[in-house]
Curated annotation (Swiss-Prot):
GO terms for molecular function: adenyl-nucleotide exchange factor activity; protein homodimerization activity; protein-folding chaperone binding; unfolded protein binding. It is found in: Mitochondrion matrix. InterPro entries: GrpE, GrpE_coiled_coil, GrpE_head. Probable component of the PAM complex at least composed of a mitochondrial HSP70 protein, GRPEL1 or GRPEL2, TIMM44, TIMM16/PAM16 and TIMM14/DNAJC19. Its main location: mitochondrion. This is GrpE protein homolog 2, mitochondrial.
Length: 224
């Protein structure tokens, strides 16, 4: 009797056990889904660094842009200063050139003042009220004054590199001589040479600044 009762209980429990087993498998599915979700979230947890990547790169570019902008501003300031300095140098140079043009002959003029003083003293010797007896003395003073004036003038010219050209007997040179006419070659005068100087020429430090006006000797008797 007890054995039959135990068999009946087991038989009734089998469907419940089967149902419980099927339910148990269903219960496992949610846990597996949650596990999958958790794993997926864990896998996706590495995505944020990828999302932060562009942000860091953008930051670096902005910093670089700011740095370049500062460099551009610095270079602009330097350029403006260089332009200003160049303009100042140009103005100073121009002023120096203008001063050189104006005051370049200052030393020469200072020496000429002494010549003017001698000339003034010489002319003071001449007076309308000079007595006939004093004319000889006056002429002597004038002669001495003019001689002193000539000597002083030559000294001033030599000091400043001004040289007088008196090319009598020199071969005609169109770079130094201005031909006025031809004259017959006389005794001791070679054709093609300067026979007579009408006006002296001048050189300044070896450079001709005024041609000498000359007459050149030729073999022909014809005067041009």
């Amino acid at each position: 009797m007890a054995a039959r009762l135990l068999w009946a209980v087991r038989r009734r429990m089998q469907p419940l056990a089967a149902h419980a087993a099927s339910e148990g498998r269903g219960w496992l599915h949610p846990f597996s889904t949650a596990t999958q979700r958790t794993a997926g979230e864990d896998c996706n947890s590495e995505d944020p660094p990828d999302e932060l990547g562009p942000s860091l790169a953008e930051r670096a570019l902005k910093l670089k842009a700011v740095k370049l902008e500062k460099e551009v501003q610095d270079l602009t300031v330097r350029y403006q200063r260089a332009v200003a300095d160049s303009e100042n140098i140009r103005r100073r140079t121009q002023r120096c050139v203008e001063d050189a043009k104006i005051f370049g002959i200052q030393s020469f003029c200072k020496d000429l003042v002494e010549v003017a003083d001698i000339l003034e003293k010489t002319t003071e010797c001449i007076s309308e009220e000079t007595e006939p007896a004093d004319q000889k003395l006056t002429l002597e003073k004038i002669f001495r004054g003019l001689s002193l004036l000539e000597a002083k003038l030559k000294s001033v010219f030599a000091k400043h590199g001004l040289e007088k050209m008196t090319p009598i007997g020199d071969k005609y040179d169109p770079h130094e001589h201005e031909l006025i006419c031809h004259v017959p070659a006389g005794v001791g005068v070679q054709p093609g040479t300067v026979a007579f100087v009408r006006q002296d020429g001048y050189k300044l430090h070896g450079r001709t600044i005024r041609l000498a006006q000359v007459e050149v000797a030729v073999e022909s008797q014809r005067r041009l």
